[in-house]
């Protein structure tokens, strides 16, 4: 899955988009920064704009920490 920035409104203030029951896209104004996937009690932070090719960058116990990892990477 690829989330195309040109399909999003530039006026959107959303930082996260739920794309499945356990997967969120982390968004900037113009780009998809990465994803957070819930795996049991762990949140896996992935970097990259394509979910199927994103690279794992961290695993966190808290959702907000996983999102912060994606934003920092």
Regions found by a protein language model. Name each.
Residues 34-55:
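Short aromatic-glycine-(Arg/Gly/Cys) micro-motifs in beta-strand/loop hairpins
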Residues 1-27, 49, 57:
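Negatively charged, low-complexity tracts enriched in Asp/Glu with abundant Ser/Thr
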Residues 58-73:
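Charged low-complexity stretches with an acidic bias
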Residues 21, 29-31, 40-41:
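Short strand-connecting beta-turns/loops that link adjacent beta-strands
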């Amino acid at each position: 899955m690829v989330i195309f920035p040109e399909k999003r409104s530039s006026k959107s203030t959303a930082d996260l988009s739920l794309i499945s029951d356990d997967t969120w896209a982390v968004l900037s104004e113009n780009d998809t920064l990465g994803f957070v996937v819930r795996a049991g009690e762990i949140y896996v932070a992935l970097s990259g704009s394509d979910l199927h090719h994103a690279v794992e960058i961290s695993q966190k116990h808290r959702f907000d920490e996983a999102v912060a990892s994606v934003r920092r990477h």
